[in-house]
Amino acid sequence: MAQSSKYQRKPRSGERKRSQRRLELTEEQKKQFDDLLVRTGLTFENRKLLIQAFTHSSYVNEQRIFSSSDNERLEFLGDAVLELAVSQYLFKTYKNMSEGDMTKLRASIVCEPSLARFAEELQFGKLVLLGKGEEVTGGRTRPALLADVFEAFIGALYMDQGLEPVFMFLARFMYPKIKEGAFTYKMDFKSQLQEFVQRDNRGQIRYLIVQERGPAHDREFVSDVQLNEETIGTGTGRSKKEAEQLAAKQALLALNQKES
């Protein structure tokens, strides 16, 4: 039976005011979001999702907007989407990598410091809508906040357009850094170079110590790495292993630049 209107709870004045409040951007903020889309080459059918990805809970609380307007739910979704996208990339790219190594490498890619760096490179910090308290305590540059925003952005992109645009975005801004060896959780550069060469049947890799210099207590080694007898990288280190690793790193950078 329907409850009599006489006994229905009337909304408090604060609740009514809160429900009517809408998030509105300044012209400068709108321009910053437009600039972001230009830089990333993306479009959003639903711009509200894009803005929500950058809306911190402190801003929602201060502005008395519905709590569902902050980016926490999108962050939750983006975390899962990012794990899937990175997992698929590693699975397809490193065909000889063990499950354990893929797990470690993925963890180094989707961890807070890594995601915060991506957010910084994309200048996400200046777009975040923050409460005054969070602003004065340095929230705009806090790694944890930036990492959350990056995940929320991925979640928003997925909700707006699906997985394929997410893959394309990551292929432009994240995957190249994986190939360059930016995430070396400790899959070493020699292993990465070996994977790279084997993947396309490019030939044989060989390491040569071409020089040793300095006194015994402060020895320095120089290593060349060759692909089919052609030197593709050189490294210098305090041990032969370190020199070979740095040679492999240089070779990876050179090969990736040649392909791009």
UniProtKB/Swiss-Prot annotation:
User: A cellular component term (GO) from this record?
Assistant: cytoplasm
What SMART domains does this protein map onto? DSRM (SM00358), RIBOc (SM00535)
The biological processes this protein is annotated with in GO are: mRNA processing; regulation of gene expression; rRNA processing; tRNA processing
Q: In which family does this protein belong, per the annotation?
A: Belongs to the ribonuclease III family.
Location in the cell reads: Cytoplasm
> Which purpose does this protein serve, as stated in its record?
Digests double-stranded RNA. Involved in the processing of primary rRNA transcript to yield the immediate precursors to the large and small rRNAs (23S and 16S). Processes some mRNAs, and tRNAs when they are encoded in the rRNA operon. Processes pre-crRNA and tracrRNA of type II CRISPR loci if present in the organism.
* Region spans: Disordered: 1-24
Which residue intervals define the domain DRBM in the entry? 188-257
Q: Which HAMAP family match?
A: RNase_III (MF_00104)
Name listed for the protein in its UniProt record:
Ribonuclease 3
Q: Which residues form the active site?
A: 79, 151
